[in-house]
Amino acid sequence: MRLFPQLFCQLTHLYVGEAWEDAAYRNQSLAQVQESFDNDIRMSSRVIGGVNFIALDNGYYLFEEDQLAFLQSEAEKGLPMVLMMHNPLYEKEFYEQITYHREQIGLRPSSNLPCAYLTGVPAELMGHYDDHRRRQQTPDEVTLRTIEWIRSCPLIRAVLAGHVHYSHVAKLTEDVPQIITSVTDVRVITVT
């Protein structure tokens, strides 16, 4: 018996090999990786203390149609929701910090202007990305619809993310914080 309920969220580096990082690449080893987890690592939920914690796989900067449908069906429960995902969602202030002010926030400097490694960065802000990163991180229509749904859903209380190895709290909307954690962070979050 587990002392605490567990819910795992997919991480970018769970899958093996080197290839174009997308759903097809992920699916090459998904079944093997999935065997190690109790929940579906692409999308799953668990209600803990009256809060619906939802894990979504956006490890390759995209959401899929079935994930949006899953979110919408989870909202039908009417419970407060906390989303967990690997890559943070685009938020202007955080994008500017991680792209243009890396050294001031404690990240290593880059010899060229880096990409932000966020899901949903507007295409017009990707002009300085190298070709590989621009193609990898350009949001598709489903991803943009999913992000818009997340921003507009009144049940979402917070988004928890990581990936960028930097701690930051951003306002995804006026009422929804996006809490980005580094590998050494421990946070206590109160959900109302």
Tell me the role of every PLM-derived stretch.
Residues M1-V82, E96, Y100-Y117, S152-L155, ...:
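Extended active-site neighborhood of metal-dependent phosphoesterases/phosphodiesterases
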Residues L14, L89-E91:
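Feature marks short, surface-exposed loop/turn motifs that line or immediately flank catalytic pockets
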Residues A55, T138, G162:
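Small/polar loops that bind or transfer phosphate-bearing groups
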Residues L68, T143-I147:
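Extracytoplasmic/secreted envelope proteins and their assembly/folding machinery
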Residues V82-L89, V159-S167:
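Histidine-centered catalytic micro-motifs
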Residues Q104-V142:
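Low-complexity, serine/threonine/proline-enriched polar segments
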Residues D140-L144, A170-K171:
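Active-site-flanking ligand-binding surface segments in enzyme catalytic domains
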Residues E148-H163:
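Functionally important transmembrane alpha-helices
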